[in-house]
Each structure stands twice: as C-alpha cells, then as structure tokens.
C-alpha cells in the first residue's frame, strides 16, 4: 500500500508524515512531496525511525514521482490561516494549488483515494471533483474532504465536559468543515446527556475551535498537530478498508445523494473501493435540525464557488 502526503513540508504535512511513519502497516510505502526543497530532508529525518515503513521525499514543481502508484493521496498543501482570517480567506491561494495538484493526480494515479485537507474544504473538494470530472476519471467514492478534526475535537471537548475517557466517546459530525456548517450531533453521543445550555455552548466551541488555536498561536500558525492526528486517523482508516478490513466507519465530506447539498459530511462505511455506503446519521434533535437547515445556504454557496472556479 502506498500513501502519498502532498504538502509534506508544512506543519500539518510533517506531523502527518511522522504519525504515518509510526503507524502504517508493515511493508507500506510513504511518499512525501512538497514544493519546498527541505522535503527530501524531512523524509531522511523520518527514515531514521525504526518502523517497517519505507519513506521517500520529493520536492520541486512536479509531484508526479511521489504520486506514481499511490493508493491513497492526502493533500495538505496550501497556506495556513492567520489571526483575523477565516477558512474562506484562504480560497484565493489554495484553490489554485488544489486544482493543479488534482490535475496531476488525474493523470498519474486516477484510481487513488484522495483525502483533501487543504482549506476551505467545503470548496476545495468541489474543485477537485470538477477537475477529475473534466479529465474523465472522477469516482465520487474515492474523493473525501477530511473533516476528522471536527470529530476528534468533539470527542475531546465532550470527554472533558463529562469527565469521560475520550477514547470511549463517539460524536458524529455532519455538514461541512467551517463555522456554522460544522454540526456535531451531540444528541447521539451514547451514555451522555446534555442540558440545552451545554449544547448551546459546546456546539459553537466545536465550530470555532480552529480560531481558538489560531489566536492562541498569536500569528505563529494554525491547528497543525491536531490536524495531523486527524488526517492520520482518517488515512489509516482508508488503508484498513482498502486492505479488506470490514466495518471501518469515519465521518467525511463526500458526494452523496444530494439530499442537502452535493457534498455533505456524515458517517461513511469505507471499503475496498473507497465509499462502501453512506450511512444514515439518524434522527436529529430540534436544535440540530434548525442548525442543519440554517447552514445549508452557506454550504451550497461554498460548493458553488468551487464548481465555478474550474468552469
């Protein structure tokens, strides 16, 4: 199994590469690519970690050597948020980066599963889909917006609030991956009850957790380490499912039946071909139903921007 990390010299990419080097199954190949010349050095550094995962780094304008033969491609390339920016402020730079990288994927490894980490995910996934469609290689079961960070934040904050082991908490998060489009389904957390006040406080905290980190880093970056962990969790789940393990479920932002929007995050059963089944997210509370309905215009607007960028 070959996994390619694109944008591997950045804060997320390096954290993700470190985790994958330690946690990918024995015999896996890990390819690191970034435009930055430091990338082969990042791979050399990680190659000294004694795990049965081979690693190679590539830099320069062309990601093709890193992409050749890849089963999974995780894209974290782009610029990070700074204080005062929201994820959509990143669009002007990151849209072009995702477009050109996806064009290379369409030619080099069109059958790979692609996980998009680069923000704004609500929009960059739509860009990737349109690029792949134009190239005649789009498979909606193999393109994912990685929203796992919203899930792990939800699990962490719920565990803290309720004094539970975070490893035992499961919180489905639906919708999109920015602001009001992030909807944690707190009503579905098993073995935990929330007051209306707790839900009203916890929901926006999860939605704005990225801003919390950006401000805490005081201009020194955004959420890179927790995002690296989230992307590793999703990447490893993909690898397990592609290898034939059954019952692997993660929330991700994918093209489904279009009930709410063309792309929508919800629980996904992963399989040998990517999305095996888009699972029902069950019944919503009145609070969640209202939040869902009020976010849809924002989400659909984000998607439209991505679609129009490629036209």
Swiss-Prot record:
Keywords: NAD, Oxidoreductase, Tricarboxylic acid cycle. Its EC number is 1.1.1.37. GO terms for cellular component: cytoplasm. It catalyses: (S)-malate + NAD(+) = oxaloacetate + NADH + H(+). It holds the Pfam family Ldh_1_N. One of its GO terms (molecular function) is L-malate dehydrogenase (NAD+) activity. The keyword Oxidoreductase applies. Gene3D superfamilies: Lactate dehydrogenase/glycoside hydrolase, family 4, C-terminal, NAD(P)-binding Rossmann-like Domain. Belongs to the LDH/MDH superfamily. MDH type 1 family. The active site is at residue 177. It comes from the Bacteria. It comes from Aliivibrio fischeri (strain ATCC 700601 / ES114). PROSITE patterns: MDH (PS00068). The keyword NAD applies. Catalyzes the reversible oxidation of malate to oxaloacetate. Substrate binds at residues 81, 87, 119, 153. GO terms for biological process: malate metabolic process; tricarboxylic acid cycle. InterPro entries: L-lactate/malate_DH, Lactate/malate_DH_C, Lactate/malate_DH_N, Lactate_DH/Glyco_Ohase_4_C, Malate_DH_AS, Malate_DH_type1, Malate_DH_type1_bac, NAD(P)-bd_dom_sf. This is Malate dehydrogenase. Homodimer. NAD(+) binds at residues 7-13, 34, 94, 117-119, 227.
């Amino acid at each position: 199994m070959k996994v390619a990390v694109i944008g591997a010299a950045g804060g997320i990419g390096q954290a993700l590469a470190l985790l994958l080097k330690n946690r990918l199954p024995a015999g896996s190949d890990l390819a690191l690519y970034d435009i930055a010349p430091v990338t082969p050095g990042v791979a050399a550094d990680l190659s000294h970690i004694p795990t049965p995962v081979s690693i190679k780094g590539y830099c320069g304008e062309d990601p093709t050597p890193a992409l050749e033969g890849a089963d999974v491609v995780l894209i974290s390339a782009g610029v990070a948020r700074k204080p005062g920016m929201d994820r959509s402020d990143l669009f002007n730079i990151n849209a072009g980066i995702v477009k050109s990288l996806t064009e290379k994927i369409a030619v080099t490894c069109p059958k790979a599963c692609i996980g998009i980490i680069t923000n704004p995910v609500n929009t960059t996934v739509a860009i990737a889909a349109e690029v792949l469609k134009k190239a005649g290689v789009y498979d909606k079961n193999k393109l994912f917006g990685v929203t796992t960070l919203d899930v792990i934040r939800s699990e962490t904050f719920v565990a803290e609030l309720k004094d539970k082991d975070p490893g035992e908490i499961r919180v489905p998060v639906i919708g999109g991956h920015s602001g009001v489009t992030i909807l944690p389904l707190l009503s579905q957390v098993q073995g935990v009850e929330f007051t209306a006040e707790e839900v009203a406080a916890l929901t926006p905290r999860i939605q704005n957790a990225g801003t919390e980190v950006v401000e805490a880093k005081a201009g020194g970056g955004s959420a890179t380490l927790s995002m690296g962990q989230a992307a590793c969790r999703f990447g490893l789940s993909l690898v397990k499912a592609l290898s034939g393990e059954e019952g692997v479920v993660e929330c991700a932002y994918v093209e489904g039946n279009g009930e709410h929007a063309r792309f929508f995050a919800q629980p996904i059963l992963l399989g040998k071909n990517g999305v095996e089944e888009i699972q029902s997210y069950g019944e919503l509370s009145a609070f969640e139903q209202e939040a869902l309905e009020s976010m849809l215009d924002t989400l659909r607007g984000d998607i439209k921007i991505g679609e129009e960028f490629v036209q």
